Amino acid sequence: MAIVPEPAKEVMANYGDNNNDLLFEADGPKEMKCCTQNLDLGSLRNGSIQLQISHQLWNKSIRQMVSVIVAVEKPMKNPSSQAFCDDDQKSIFSFIFEEEPIILETCNDDFVCDANVQSMECKLQDKDHKSLVLAGPHMLKALHLLTGDLKREVVFCMSFVQGDDSNNKIPVTLGIKGKNLYLSCVMKDNTPTLQLEDIDPKRYPKRDMEKRFVFYKTEIKNRVEFESALYPNWYISTSQAEQKPVFLGNSKGRQDITDFTMEVLSP
């Protein structure tokens, strides 16, 4: 970086007052009273640049404060036939100041995945008061439990994730507490199917979950519904019969049960 030398005393002696000088500092130009050297702009050639040094009463060095004056039009005895216009300013400033491109960095999805995920533990029963239990390593069934068997009920870890949420639809995932299992929706035999999928606990849960794991939770009075985000109008459902697997159905409001009561165990 070039260093502006300190002006000699005899040069400073020839300075005069100019109340309209602008001083360019780190926080922007400021107008203030200062002592400046009287220079004849008419002696400058077209396109030349003059450095006007300001000598302040403050404790400022020449390196901190320099006024730049651009000779934009040479005074002439006869008035110019062409007025100075905006295009002339553009050409002068483009010559002095170099434009640099601004590079915008795209957001890395990893930061979204690493964001804290809000979760809560809960239990679900369908509107017929059937509880959801594990029947085998990868199957959920709905059945009525006696008081002594209530410990068999599955405890879900419901996580709030990204999705096309609205006022009454909240995107969530449903994992089983104590298991590396999540409910997910896949296509089998040309039919959307509900399954329990093994997951890597080091990667899940995360804010940006794959769509097959996401359900839109809708509250209707005191009950909730879970609609597949991947397959709209397909809901987590139970049969009216006892001990039948929990499945993904599209007969909402008919023979299949899509309404559940939710017991929150922890926020």
Curated annotation (Swiss-Prot):
One Pfam assignment: IL1_propep
CDD domains: beta-trefoil_IL1B (cd23296)
Keyword Secreted: yes
Subcellular location: Cytoplasm, Cytosol; Secreted; Lysosome; Secreted, Extracellular exosome
Family annotation (PROSITE patterns): INTERLEUKIN_1 (PS00253)
Any GO BP: fever generation
Disulfide links within the chain: none
Annotated propeptide span(s): 1-114
One GO cellular component term: extracellular space
Primary subcellular site in the record, as a coarse category: cytoplasm
Keywords per UniProt: Cytokine, Cytoplasm, Host-virus interaction, Inflammatory response, Lysosome, Mitogen, Pyrogen, Secreted
Alphabetized Gene3D superfamilies for the sequence: 2.80.10.50
Site entry (Important for interaction with integrin), positions: K169, K177, K179, K188, K202
Any one GO molecular function term: interleukin-1 receptor binding
SUPFAM superfamilies per the UniProt record, alphabetical: Cytokine
Miscellaneous comment in the UniProt entry for this protein: IL1B production occurs in 2 steps, each being controlled by different stimuli. First, inflammatory signals, such as LPS, stimulate the synthesis and promote the accumulation of cytosolic stores of pro-IL1B (priming). Then additional signals are required for inflammasome assembly, leading to CASP1 activation, pro-IL1B processing and eventually secretion of the active cytokine. IL1B processing and secretion are temporarily associated.
Function: Potent pro-inflammatory cytokine. Initially discovered as the major endogenous pyrogen, induces prostaglandin synthesis, neutrophil influx and activation, T-cell activation and cytokine production, B-cell activation and antibody production, and fibroblast proliferation and collagen production. Promotes Th17 differentiation of T-cells. Synergizes with IL12/interleukin-12 to induce IFNG synthesis from T-helper 1 (Th1) cells. Plays a role in angiogenesis by inducing VEGF production synergistically with TNF and IL6.
Family membership: Belongs to the IL-1 family.
Subunit-structure text: (Microbial infection) Interacts with African swine fever virus (ASFV) protein L83L. Monomer. In its precursor form, weakly interacts with full-length MEFV; the mature cytokine does not interact at all. Interacts with integrins ITGAV:ITGBV and ITGA5:ITGB1; integrin-binding is required for IL1B signaling. Interacts with cargo receptor TMED10; the interaction is direct and is required for the secretion of IL1B mature form. Interacts with HSP90AB1; the interaction facilitates cargo translocation into the ERGIC. Interacts with HSP90B1; the interaction facilitates cargo translocation into the ERGIC.
Official protein name in the record: Interleukin-1 beta
Source organism (scientific name): Sus scrofa (Pig)
